[in-house]
């Protein structure tokens, strides 16, 4: 924590306001609250929340950079896969949580340039602040014709048919934190210690999770995340869509990788001014809080809902399968400055040391045939 930047005066006032609200919630709840409630408040509070308040989250002035911001290769590769799936589906796209809007901008520009029909581009976004930013960049970058195809929705449309895409959407759902002790599961709640927010272990083991998580080989002290909020949202989501190919892109693992004896401290991560750390009680409302997705669990929920898992690959494999090297080859190596920028961007997207292996792509189909472009090599769905 000592190497992290200092809060601005505005950020300090936001932190203090959220800190007081959380302490009040803890006192009113008898001494502790779930971590998911803390996460919900600090990320989504109407006035002070990280995503819903004043904060600039993305790019150099923000706290982190997402894949679409690195290069339009990312969006163009997904458009290649979407185009193949439009053979079986209406030419409509629903993006869940569009961030700063860069993915939609790059995809729609490429679609117009290559005469790929897009009937509608829907964006599901709960943050009015982000909607305004997305509208601003799209109105600036898109032609009038393609901007007119974009529509913002506050609920996932029932009986939607088309492509559904989500990049770093699942890991923003509030999650609870749990710890293994003598093969039993205890929730790590949030309490007050010495007038500061701190972890507080629940007194009783969580029997509900015992039937979901196999704790037999997990050591005492092992920490993990589980989001009932995400489960409930996905169960409803899979039920209401009618016919779709779904692409979830996020940091995460198969269950056997996630629940490994060497991964004992959980995956909770905070980002502030491009610094990563693991203290969720610092910089309230000024930092992002995320966790890594259990893709095996996502797969199970999808199958229970009658969907089919079409593929599961690393981001690097998806992009290369879907044409990233072809897009890179469009740039002239003799233009040293431009080519260096493009190759560096490609490395960030595909390198195992960067996003390439840490981020995964899962394809889920409901009531449709699918094209496997993006998943056609190095598919790991059998490991889920």
Regions inferred by a protein language model and the residue ranges of each:
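Rossmann-like AdoMet
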Residues: 1-96, 100-160, 317, 323-326, ...
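A residue-level signal for conserved active-site and pocket-lining positions in enzyme catalytic cores
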Residues: 42, 164, 298
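Short, glycine/acidic-enriched loop or turn micro-motifs at the edges of active sites
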Residues: 128, 170, 253
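Short helix/loop capping segments that flank catalytic or ligand/cofactor-binding pockets
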Residues: 51, 172-175, 257, 371-373
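Conserved RecA-like P-loop NTPase ATPase core
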Residues: 74, 164, 250
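Generic beta-sheet signal
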Residues: 91, 162, 244-247
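A mobile, often basic/glycine-rich helix-loop segment
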Residues: 165-211, 261-271
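Long, Lys/Arg- and hydrophobic-enriched amphipathic alpha-helices
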Residues: 211-384
């Amino acid at each position: 924590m000592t190497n992290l930047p200092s809060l601005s005066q505005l950020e300090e006032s936001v932190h203090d306001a959220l800190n007081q609200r959380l302490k009040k919630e803890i006192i009113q709840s008898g001494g502790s609250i779930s971590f998911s409630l803390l996460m919900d408040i600090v990320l989504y509070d109407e006035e002070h929340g990280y995503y819903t308040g004043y904060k600039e989250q993305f790019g150099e002035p923000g706290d982190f950079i997402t894949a679409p911001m690195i290069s339009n290769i990312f969006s163009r590769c997904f458009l290649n896969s979407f185009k193949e799936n439009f053979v079986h589906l209406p030419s409509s796209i629903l993006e869940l949580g569009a961030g700063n809007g860069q993915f939609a901008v790059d995809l729609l520009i490429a679609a117009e340039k290559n005469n790929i029909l897009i009937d509608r581009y829907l964006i599901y976004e709960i943050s009015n602040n982000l909607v305004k930013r997305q509208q601003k960049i799209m109105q600036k970058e898109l032609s009038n014709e393609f901007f007119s195809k974009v529509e913002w929705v506050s609920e996932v449309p029932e009986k939607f048919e088309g492509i559904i895409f989500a990049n770093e959407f699942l890991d923003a759902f509030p999650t609870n934190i749990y710890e293994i002790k003598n093969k039993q599961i205890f929730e790590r709640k949030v309490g007050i210690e010495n007038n500061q927010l701190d972890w507080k272990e629940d007194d009783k083991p969580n029997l509900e999770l015992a039937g979901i998580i196999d704790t037999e080989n997990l050591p005492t002290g092992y920490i993990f995340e589980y989001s009932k909020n995400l489960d409930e949202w996905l169960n409803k989501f899979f039920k209401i869509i009618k016919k779709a190919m779904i692409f979830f892109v996020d940091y995460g693992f198969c269950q056997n990788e996630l629940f490994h004896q060497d991964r004992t401290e959980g995956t909770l991560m905070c980002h502030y001014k491009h610094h990563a750390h693991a203290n969720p009680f610092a910089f309230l409302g000024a930092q992002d809080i995320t966790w890594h997705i259990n893709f095996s669990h996502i797969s199970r929920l999808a199958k229970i809902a009658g969907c089919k898992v079409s593929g599961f690959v690393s981001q690097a494999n998806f992009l290369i399968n879907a044409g990233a090297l072809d897009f890179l080859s469009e740039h002239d190596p003799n233009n040293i400055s431009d080519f260096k920028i493009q190759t560096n961007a490609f490395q960030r997207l595909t390198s195992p040391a960067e996003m390439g292996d840490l981020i995964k792509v899962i394809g889920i189909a409901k009531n449709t045939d699918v094209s496997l472009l993006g998943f056609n090599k190095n598919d790991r769905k059998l490991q889920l």
